[in-house]
Amino acid sequence: MTRQNTDYGYDIQKVYLEMFMTDAESFVRCQGVFDPKTFDRRLQGSAEFIKDYVEQYNALPTFDMVNAATEGNLKDPGQLGENHYDWLLQDFETFSKHKALEAAILKSAD
């Protein structure tokens, strides 16, 4: 099920990053479409740090590490159920498609 006209603003993008940081399996599954440039400007530094850290150390950084390195404000969402991560995977896929389409439209306008 693909949702239309969804607002992929700062708050939901922040939730994506916070949830990815608590579940390595979900991050790995989305790593192929995880592009820090698609995130809100205020979150790009955190997204880039997470991506680079995972590539270099093959593990997720801590919230303190990301926040200290990027002056971010990511918070641990606490214990989440499997259904929460199912939502994350589905919603992040839709977000990624939306951002790819948005980029293609902007590129074609140039």
Features from the language model and the residues they span:
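Conserved P-loop NTPase architecture
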Residues: 106-110
